Design a protein with these regions (language model features):
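A conserved FAD-binding loop/helix module that cradles the flavin
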Residues: 306-332
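A glycine-rich dinucleotide-binding beta-alpha-beta segment and adjacent secondary-structure elements
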Residues: 32-45, 251-310
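Active-site-proximal substrate-binding core of FAD-dependent oxidoreductases
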Residues: 93, 99, 329-342
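Hydrophobic, well-ordered secondary-structure elements that form the walls
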Residues: 120, 159, 211, 245, ...
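Rossmann-like flavin
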Residues: 1-50
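Mid-domain catalytic core of redox enzymes
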Residues: 95-204
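C-terminal segments that line or cap access tunnels to active or ligand-binding sites in enzymes
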Residues: 162-265
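Helical element adjacent to the flavin cofactor pocket in flavoenzyme catalytic cores
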Residues: 56-110
């Protein structure tokens, strides 16, 4: 309750901030550096309220990222699940959910049927309802998701640098004049994550660095794949970024030993997400929708994942998993028990 009282002064501003984009809010600052930094926090297309929530979370010390990244988080969850007696079958991609007489009865993997009492679909919901069943599913909330979803996409660039950058900040923002172009997008600035002080990210004396270029470039990369220029286009982008960064950081010139470029097609292949998107834009004037974890037409079918509660993110994905299991327990007259690992 005391926390709610502290938030009261902010409440009158929420409607106005929700109707303004993060870009528009950032443009209100005179200092170029502040404007560019604010544009990179949540993405320019989000509403300004999303920016406020993110900044408040960080300022309160209540936000961060999983140690080792999302993959390490998934590995830890998998280990805990297996320690509890659960079984995981790796390197097997589900082709479709089996439905008989209006009930989900299992999944098909490479022409092998695995029967189950219930199925919880955790792949991107938007992708699942279109591709994981004999026919695309059509329910009111699914149609709403198809219509309203504004996918977040990026092209992610990673560099392995044979230089110790531990004397530099963990995050740096560089502006470019003139800008450079890739996949039809103009890049005026670049936010660089510097992992020099993180153990295990690079050999001793070396540095791993990453940067995300936001923008819907799915169709461009898809076309490049079709034309056969995909790998060359990725190489050209990496070389452009390396050249531009070397002009800002002379100590990395000729020191980049390895690079990797992940496009929306990479995310699509690796994670099975809709157009390779990993979150949903909540733009100005948008009212975030919370979608059901169950199907109205198919029994024993449950959904979980970041797409169910825009804008998404790892915490949302975990929460929706918990919700799906609570529905499963309700439907099977099972008492839901949840406790943190000891």
């Amino acid at each position: 309750i005391s926390m709610l009282f502290k938030m009261l002064p902010m409440l009158p501003r929420i409607p106005a901030l929700s109707k303004m984009s993060a870009r528009e809010y950032a443009e209100g600052f005179q200092h170029l550096g502040i404007r560019e930094i604010l544009k990179t926090v949540v993405g320019s297309d989000y509403n300004a309220m999303s920016l406020m929530f993110t900044l408040a979370t960080l300022a309160a010390g209540d936000g961060g990222y999983p140690e080792g990244g999302s993959l390490s988080m998934a590995h830890r969850m998998a280990k805990h699940y297996e320690d509890l007696g659960g079984e995981i079958e790796y390197n097997k991609r589900v082709q479709k959910v089996l439905v008989k007489k209006g009930r989900a009865v299992g999944v098909e993997i490479s022409d092998e049927e695995i029967l189950a009492d219930a199925v919880v679909v955790t792949i991107d919901t938007l992708s699942a309802i279109d591709h994981l069943f004999d026919q695309p599913l059509h329910e009111p909330w699914m149609e709403k998701m198809r219509t309203n979803t504004k996918p977040v996409m990026n092209t992610f660039v990673c560099l392995g640098i044979e230089a110790d950058l531990s004397d530099l900040p963990e995050n740096m923002l560089f502006t470019f004049d003139p800008p450079f172009f890739y996949a039809g997008e103009q890049v005026n600035s670049l936010s660089v994550n510097n992992y020099a002080t993180y153990k295990g990210y690079a050999p001793k004396g070396c540095t791993s660095a990453t940067m995300g270029l936001m923008g819907d470039t799915y169709d461009y990369w898809k076309n490049a794949k079709t034309k056969g220029t995909y790998e060359q286009d990725k190489k050209q982008l990496a070389e452009t970024i390396i050249e531009r960064l070397a002009a800002k950081l002379p100590q990395i010139k000729d020191k980049v030993a390895v690079w990797d470029v992940a496009t929306p097609l990479t995310y699509e292949r690796y994670c099975g997400t809709y157009k390779g998107s990993w979150m949903t834009v909540v733009g100005k004037g948008d009212k975030p929708s919370i979608y059901p974890s169950t199907s109205e037409k198919i029994a024993n079918l449950y959904f979980a994942g970041q797409r169910l509660q825009p804008p998404g993110g790892l915490p949302v994905a975990v929460v929706t998993g918990r919700t799906a299991i609570q529905y499963l327990c309700r439907d099977t007259n099972t008492v839901f028990q949840g406790s943190p690992p000891l």
